[in-house]
Amino acid sequence: QTGTYFQEGVRGNDSAVRAWIVDLRGNGGGLTSAAVSALGAFSGEGDLIYFVDQDGESAAQRYSGKDLTDKPAIVLMDSGSASASEIFAGGVLGTGSGIVIGTRSYGKGVAQVLYDESNCPYLHGDAVKVTAYRFYCAGGNTTDRIGVVPTLYIPQDQAVAAARLLSGEKT
């Protein structure tokens, strides 16, 4: 639902903004499909994330719609931003759709597969998460153990003010 809500917000408010401020500080992630859908609002059609397994086999997650805005994204990040939030921020950088400000993100560049009763009949009420893939953002960069390096390092107590200034918002 997150990706759908994000796109509806962009579609309904694009004429009222000069830039989109996306605050992902402290966001531990979520579904990769939501990150791809949100990123697609800025980038348009294309392969926006790549998963590579231990054998080197890769698969792309593609966004097949058109971009919903020509305005840039200004993404706020910190060390608590991980996983799908890093996919979004790294994708913004990789597609040239905007900038990232704040501090370096967590650096979780891997994805897990969940095995539970729905796909593994011998787990009776239990579940197991197995790290199965390393992911690469649009542009080919991994965040694993590195994080997303911001375009501009900004102390967290100044990040929102900096984003507003960069967006051209009148203060």
What positions do the PLM features span?
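C-terminal, low-ordered peptide segments at domain boundaries
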Residues: 1-18, 144-168
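Cleft-lining beta-strand/loop regions that shape enzyme active-site pockets
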Residues: 1-122
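Conserved P-loop NTPase
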Residues: 112-117, 126-162
